[in-house]
Amino acid sequence: MASMSLSFSSSLCSSRIPEGKRRFRHRDVGIVRCVLAASKSSPGSVTKKRLWKDGEFPGITEPVNQRRTPIKNVKKKLDRRSKANGWVNTVTETLSDLIAKKQWLQALEVFDMLREQTFYQPKEGTYMKLLVLLGKSGQPNRAQKLFDEMLEEGLEPTVELYTALLAAYTRSNLIDDAFSILDKMKSFPQCQPDVFTYSTLLKACVDASQFDLVDSLYKEMDERLITPNTVTQNIVLSGYGRVGRFDQMEKVLSDMLVSTACKPDVWTMNIILSVFGNMGKIDMMESWYEKFRNFGIEPETRTFNILIGSYGKKRMYDKMSSVMEYMRKLEFPWTTSTYNNIIEAFADVGDAKNMELTFDQMRSEGMKADTKTFCCLINGYANAGLFHKVISSVQLAAKFEIPENTAFYNAVISACAKADDLIEMERVYIRMKERQCVCDSRTFEIMVEAYEKEGMNDKIYYLEQERQKLMDRTVATKEMENLPAG
């Protein structure tokens, strides 16, 4: 496995390679327009000499300026201004590109560079995008720091900005911190929490199965005369279904059917189908699909993707194919998620041949692969024992500039464990930490299981110590942030 180890390390540690030309059905050409600022007149202008009396001639004569600026110097000034404007556009475009690619660390570095410039003006939209990015990247502490810096720059907080900060904490399951943000919002008249704020907090409580907090939040919303909308109800509906509380789920759904403010929609339909599909209850899933159709709710692309994924997990390939054909018939596009579900179905059973055929078709149709695509490919090749193709998948992901998130590293670590290459597994784990990618419970589970298989109890002990240190650092950081300023 020496060659495999070398390839893995070089693949993950190499710098990003810009994407080559791809074929797309539709290409949008971006046009960058740089506008040169008009030249200002010289402050030391010569006083104009009048050669007429008032009311005679509306003309003037200007004395010749013997020290007129040479044309070449004017051109140099214009070139400098053009380069400056071009630099501004380049930095802002780079920042937008990094945010779109979810590369939070590089985005913060570019943003810090931008803030040091004299022309910089703080904008609420930029902070909003960065706060959302940090929240989705599992960086609530950095989101809080960015929020504080925003206030120092003189920007006024808004409900939307506070909700984005609150969401950053909820995405990392820091519910107590999220409730603290909620309390701060209540203390500012211009930042009173709205239905979106409560929906975000409700989702966190639902995901953590803290349904007692769900009830208290509903009560608080009622006291503040905030009416739950369909999104709010869908969130709670999803939580009840995930933990198998079908009685409560049915009650929420019944309330939605008789409500005038939050009628069930296609998202409600998708949630119910996902609940039963993930549990493998195909009959219930199909039954509810027909019920929602009878309610007048039309399916969308995501609805069909849910059906395809559910059939794929149960290896019901005929029904999976039927749904795909039905999508074509109704002219619903096959999306990245559609292909991911098919690739995942073949990957789970190690069917590398059909997995590759699906991926090739995906690329031939100009469909863009994402992180999940490569996670499925890596898992599929590992399940098939084709570890050299795991390496090529990692290299291809780097070429396509696929974001390397926690799920991606977990897939590579799992592949190393299945190949019994524990040395490379440790290298990937180190690389994961160097990239400041957050390790989750799955990361440690994979490594502990690999060490247990080899009877390496000392490694397990040190790994548990590592996990405890990680938890302690998180707690210490939170405590430091909560210290009073000054």
Curated annotation (Swiss-Prot):
InterPro entries referenced in this protein's UniProt entry, alphabetically: Pentatricopeptide_rpt, PPR5-like, TPR-like_helical_dom_sf
Record-level Gene Ontology MF annotations: mRNA binding; rRNA binding
Sorted UniProt keywords: Chloroplast, Plastid, Repeat, Transit peptide
GO CC annotation terms, alphabetical: chloroplast
Main location: plastid
Localisation: Plastid, Chloroplast
Transit peptide: 1-36
PPR repeat feature ranges: 123-157, 158-188, 194-228, 229-264, 265-299, 300-334, 335-369, 370-404, 405-439, 440-470
Disulfide bonds: none
GO process annotations (BP): embryo development ending in seed dormancy; embryo sac development; pollen development; pollen tube development
Family classification: Belongs to the PPR family. P subfamily.
Name of the protein in its database record: Pentatricopeptide repeat-containing protein At3g06430, chloroplastic
Phylogenetic classification of the source organism: Eukaryota, Viridiplantae, Streptophyta, Embryophyta, Tracheophyta
